[in-house]
Amino acid sequence: LVAINALNQDSPIESIVASSYQAVSGAGAGGPIELMNEVEALGLGQQIEPKVFQYQIAYNVIPQIGGEAFDGYTSEEMKLQNEGRKIMHLPELKVSCTCVRVPVVRSHSVSLVVRTREKISVERARQLIAAAPGCRLVDDLANKRYPMPLDTSDQDLVFVGRIRDDLTSENGLNIWCCGDQVRKGAATNACLLYTSPSPRDYAASR
């Protein structure tokens, strides 16, 4: 949450819409193993029964993390919403989340639509985020530079990019963040903490 907290210091945030793309290691050590086993089996033309996830995760995304909790939202989505309000000390903040499991070993990503009371320009948002402790701005679409899980794994920073005006709201910004959920927990960024070995550890063990 360090990235959006930097914006909140400049103009109070009124609402957040977040879509979280969570790595398989967020489900524990068995997540990456199941992903790799499925990739290997499918390469041989075989099918294996998923045990960690509800469905095959290889070459797939699963739009459910946790059980059904409230009015169509999952427990993970409610957790993310409630933690955001608590950490930012904004109990009335309007937050809506969708959490998706993706076939990435490590490092969660989140797409944000942040609406503030007063308009924050894209350039001002970049300045605020670049100066925020724990953040690294990687935002150069013309040169294909933006945060990706492959580049943010095993890093202590939250990487932020794709900052642009939201076309549905005068005071909205669209933001993309990536962070290693092992190194940076929910108390300091938009990712949820869950310890697991790194991709290199899994590769070396096979």
Regions from the language model: what does each represent?
Residues 124, 129-139:
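A common structural junction motif
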Residues 173-177:
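Short FAD-binding loop at a beta-strand-to-alpha-helix junction that anchors the flavin cofactor
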Residues 148-170:
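FAD-binding beta-loop-beta segment adjacent to the flavin cofactor pocket
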Residues 103, 179-184:
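Glycine-rich phosphate/pyrophosphate-binding beta-alpha loops
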Residues 205-206:
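Hydrophobic alpha-helical segments, chiefly the membrane-spanning helices
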Residues 184, 192-193:
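Flexible, small-/acidic-enriched active-site or ligand-binding loops
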Residues 194-199:
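Conserved small/polar residues in nucleotide/adenosyl-binding loops
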Residues 1-128:
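Active-site-lining helix/loop region of Rossmann-like oxidoreductase modules
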